[in-house]
A protein has these predicted regions:
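Amphipathic protein-protein interaction modules
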Residues: 42-93
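Short, charge-rich, low-complexity alpha-helical interaction segments
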Residues: 13-36
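Short acidic/histidine-centered micro-motifs embedded in hydrophobic/aromatic stretches
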Residues: 24, 28, 75-79, 98-101
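Long, compositionally biased
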Residues: 90-117
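Short, surface-exposed loop/turn motifs that are enriched in glycine and acidic residues
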Residues: 7-15, 44-48
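Long, charge-rich, low-complexity intrinsically disordered regions
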Residues: 3-11, 112-115
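Short coil/turn segments at secondary-structure boundaries
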Residues: 37-41, 112
Length: 117
């Protein structure tokens, strides 16, 4: 699926899966592992380059596409639903921090995490 078709599905509130999100990103973009911080203050999570690559790809893609917080969370598919089903849990910390801090909490340590193929 092209990234434009995928974004149209997302913006029309059709459910998307994590697998479809990553597949769409991989089809359209060249990925460079990049470290990033998610969150603010003591709650910030530092993700080293090459770790949590799904989250890194999704946040970079959403940023390029200028998606809002809710649209970005939807890209995580069932993982986002897992967090909603367990609001006091500790799994999927990148999703939890993004729910709390939004785009203000995302900081990439490098540029060009994703480039069009």
């Amino acid at each position: 699926m092209t990234s434009n078709s995928f974004i149209n599905r997302l913006k029309s509130n059709q459910k998307v899966s994590f697998k479809d999100t990553i597949s769409t990103i991989n089809e359209s973009y060249q990925y460079t592992p990049t470290s990033f911080i998610n969150g603010l203050g003591e709650q910030a999570v530092t993700n080293a380059a090459g770790t949590n690559e799904g989250s890194c790809k999704i946040f970079a893609f959403a940023q390029l596409q200028q998606l809002d917080q809710q649209q970005t969370l939807s890209l995580f598919g069932d993982y986002y639903q897992d967090v909603l089903n367990d609001p006091n849990g500790t799994s999927h910390q990148n999703i939890r921090n993004f729910m709390r801090y939004g785009w203000a909490g995302i900081q990439f340590k490098g540029k060009n995490t994703l480039r069009l193929k």
